[in-house]
Amino acid sequence: MIGDPVMLTIRRNIQRPSKALLKSFDGMPTGFVTDAYNGKGCLDFEIKPLMPAMAFHGPAITAYCGPMDNLAAMAILDFAKKGDVIVIATSGDDTAATIGDLWAFWAKKIGVAAIVCDGLVRDVAGLLKVGIPIFARGIKPNSAFKHGPGEVNMDVTCGGVAIGPGDIIVGDRDGVVAVPLAQVEQVAAQLELVKKKESEAEARVKGGEKLKFWDPPALGDRVRYID
């Protein structure tokens, strides 16, 4: 081998969605977003918020950290901008925590909207004081090394979903949904239709109407009654 092995691969310049497209996701729950995206984009259900009131949305910047390592997570703070969602992929590594409270403090100081990690975190008491939305697979006090290899702003798989820099990430107490940058405009248009239908259905239920969630005549003899 000529020279030392590469410890980090970093893409410094990425495309983010427009402010207008981001605004179309304001206040939209994850259920609406995945419905508008044809039921796709949901990260693994094991990735949960540290506390319930942690709704967010924003463009992804991504880090890949190898087992028991967080070098890429440290480096990504130099490339984060206000409103970004830091997505940290670890291939579900459970050997050590990827981030802690001091790291989260600096992320919040930058103005990061949220952190999503398919690995583990630590310093929970401190993380809750920082107050930034954090979604992770679990908690463990072990600290990680900073040896690499790692990647920043490359395509990753987090929670079973392919995510690239600039994709829109939406999270709330139900989970996390990722919408690819190339699909954002289409999903944003569908969101308005989903919101309209949900609002109409809610008004009908509150008005006393029993909604028809299934249609027995349409199923015909494919329904078997046993009494």
Ranges and model annotations:
Residues 2-165, 179-227:
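Feature captures the catalytic cores and cofactor-binding loops of soluble hydro-lyases/lyases
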Residues 169:
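C-terminal binding/interaction regions
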Residues 172:
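Beta-strand-loop-alpha-helix segment that lines the small-molecule cofactor/substrate pocket
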Residues 175-177:
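Channel- or pocket-lining gating/hinge segments that regulate access to a cavity or pore
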